Swiss-Prot record:
Gene3D superfamilies: Glutamyl-trna Synthetase, Domain 2, Glutamyl-tRNA Synthetase, Domain 3, HUPs, Ribosomal Protein L25, Chain P. Belongs to the class-I aminoacyl-tRNA synthetase family. It is found in: Cytoplasm. PROSITE patterns: AA_TRNA_LIGASE_I. Monomer. ATP binds at residues 37-39, 43-49, 233, 263-264, 271-273. A motif ('HIGH' region) lies at residues 36-46. The keyword tRNA processing does not apply. This is Glutamine--tRNA ligase. It comes from Nitrobacter hamburgensis (strain DSM 10229 / NCIMB 13809 / X14). GO terms for molecular function: ATP binding; glutamine-tRNA ligase activity.
């Protein structure tokens, strides 16, 4: 974090600029935009941009446009358009009537390209893509002029019109801006404005055989929509001179200004759209909404509340310098949000059966359990207690170390909402594995307190063997094992333990709950019901643990 980020105050350098522009009268109102390309699913980085652009508009009484940058028809699909709109709404924002597409402006963009040609500031180039790349030069060497750079205006206009009409094959010609092949900024070395592409467009069909570049479409679309503050990430900082060049040389209706902020980088995470696509296509994950993915669809399926994501983004702030945020900050925001909202239930992830030998056979009783310890208004529920129960395997050790206070032979513990129990006998199978515990209970300790004042050092959760419901429990961890995964070798850094699937037992209330919202499994973490659930088959995803277990594992292995 830099000193330019003032997240605690809810202000940052971009908001300061907006406030100053409004105070000075430079702008009467603020208009921002979020302009995704519909060629994939939104991820954490997009969430930061969404919250910034929509948040600024909301805070300053303006509006934010949702504009799809649909200038590459071979990569764009309606599936992504629909998903992006769902994700923006899920985050809590609404573009109202301001839904736009760059393709809405294709005719105007074409006319402006002709304007540049007539002014001698654009030309048709017959060179191949590779020849153009080689002639562009390097950071230390100037570029070389195209042999077609001085084509007559009339010839350029004719060729450009024929490009549009579809007379030439893909790659045969491009339209380039005529700026400065010796510029120290490579983006100003006669960038491509249009390329030939014989491909149907999702919205315009086969009407166009040429498509504008992002750099040409972006700023002019901003101007058409009267965007006041065009906010993007730092990798576009070197594109700003080109953004301004187009606005300076075209009869545009308004003059937006581009501002750049640091993109979001998170530990144990890669946000490259290319890598995310390869993860999906390579079968490393189960789709774009796999709960391990940093996509907004994946976060939703994992059970992350939009409120937690907005709070996380608010806390990391907006800065001018790139940095990496510990994923633990996101986990903290999730825990803090869910701690307030999630009802409590009991679930045993790795069941170990216990038999309470002095509890009457064939009998059971109802006990009262609170739904939320900090909110009495959430009420209570009834849970059934009987002779046979399930506890966590991890809550028993036959030969415990000094600081292990849970169940062991001869030790007494408290069962939550129920009684004190003592382990009397350990039952093992032929392989020597513990399969059952024989215990006794103290009937006088109902509710969890002993009349004689004796204390126990552990309270454990449990479920009734007679009434518990089987459930598949999916424990999700970091997708990448290393904190700073190498994008070039991402496949080798995948965490082999990023998903563990367990066969657990849960209290029957979880089968009756008709909500897909989050729930806290007491002493375990926050979980949500997965869409794979069906009648007779419960599936739960872990959203986040109650504490940072990863840090403990990492420390133990170091």
């Amino acid at each position: 974090m830099t000193d330019e980020s003032t997240a605690d105050a809810g202000r940052d350098f971009i908001r300061d600029i907006v406030a100053a522009d409004l105070a000075s009268g430079k702008h009467k109102s603020v208009v921002t935009r979020f302009p995704p390309e519909p060629n994939g699913y939104l991820h954490l980085g997009h969430a930061k941009s969404i919250c910034l652009n929509f948040g600024i508009a909301e805070e300053f009484g303006g509006c934010c446009h949702l504009r799809f940058d649909d200038t590459n028809p071979t990569k764009e699909e309606q599936e992504y358009i629909d998903a992006i709109q769902r994700d923006v709404r899920w985050l809590g924002f609404d573009w109202g009537k301001n839904l736009h597409y760059a393709s809405d402006y294709f005719e105007q963009l074409y006319a402006w390209a002709q304007h540049l040609v007539r002014a001698g500031k654009a030309y048709v180039d017959d060179q191949s893509q590779e020849d153009i790349r080689l002639a562009r030069g390097t950071l230390t060497e100037p570029g070389r002029d195209s042999p077609f750079r001085d084509r007559p205006v009339d010839e350029n206009l004719d060729l450009f019109a024929r490009m549009r009409a579809g007379e030439f094959p893909n790659g045969a010609r491009v339209l380039r801006a005529r700026i400065d092949m010796a510029s120290g900024n490579i983006n100003l070395r006669d960038p491509v404005l249009y390329r030939i592409l014989h491909a149907p467009h999702p919205r315009t069909g086969t009407a166009w055989n040429i498509y504008p570049s992002y750099d040409f479409a972006h700023g002019q679309s901003d101007s058409i929509e009267h965007i006041t503050h065009s906010i993007c990430t730092l990798e576009f900082e070197d594109h700003r001179p080109l953004y301004d060049w187009f606005l300076d040389n075209l009869p545009v209706p308004s003059r937006p200004h581009q501002y750049e902020f640091a993109r979001l980088n998170v530990t144990h995470t890669l946000l490259s759209k290319r890598i995310l696509t390869e993860l999906v296509r390579g079968g490393h994950v189960a789709g774009w909404d796999d709960p391990r993915m940093p996509t907004l669809a994946g976060l939703q399926r994992r059970g992350v509340p939009a409120e937690a994501l907005r709070e996380f983004i608010k806390r990391i702030g907006v800065a001018k310098a790139n940095s990496t945020v510990d994923v633990g900050m996101l986990d903290f925001a999730i825990r803090e949000t869910l701690n307030k909202s999630a009802p409590r239930r009991m679930a045993v992830l790795r069941p170990l059966k216990i038999v309470i030998e002095n509890y009457p056979e064939g009998e059971s009783e109802e006990l009262e359990a609170v739904n939320h310890p900090d909110d009495p208004s959430r009420g209570t529920r009834r849970i059934r207690f009987g002779r046979e129960l399930y506890i966590e395997q991890d809550d028993f050790m036959e030969n415990p170390p000094k600081k292990f206070f849970r169940l062991s032979p001869g030790r007494e513990v408290r069962l939550r909402y129920a009684y004190f129990v003592t382990c009397r006998e350990v039952v093992k199978n032929a392989a020597g594995d513990v399969v059952e515990l024989r215990c006794t209970y103290d009937p006088a300790t109902k509710g969890g307190n002993a009349p004689d004042g004796r204390k126990v050092k552990a309270t454990m959760h449990w479920v009734s063997a007679a009434e518990a419901v089987p459930a598949e429990i999916r424990l999700y961890g970091h997708l990448f094992a290393t904190a700073q995964p190498d994008a070039a070798n991402f496949a080798s850094e995948l965490n082999p333990q990023s998903l563990e699937t367990l066969s657990g037992m849960v209290e029957p209330a979880l089968a009756r709950d008709d909500t897909d919202g989050a729930v806290q499994f007491e002493r375990q973490g926050y979980f949500c019901r997965d869409r794979d659930s069906s009648p007779g088959r419960l599936v739960f995803n872990r959203t986040v643990g109650l504490r940072d277990t990863w840090a403990k594992v990492a420390a133990a292995g170091s």
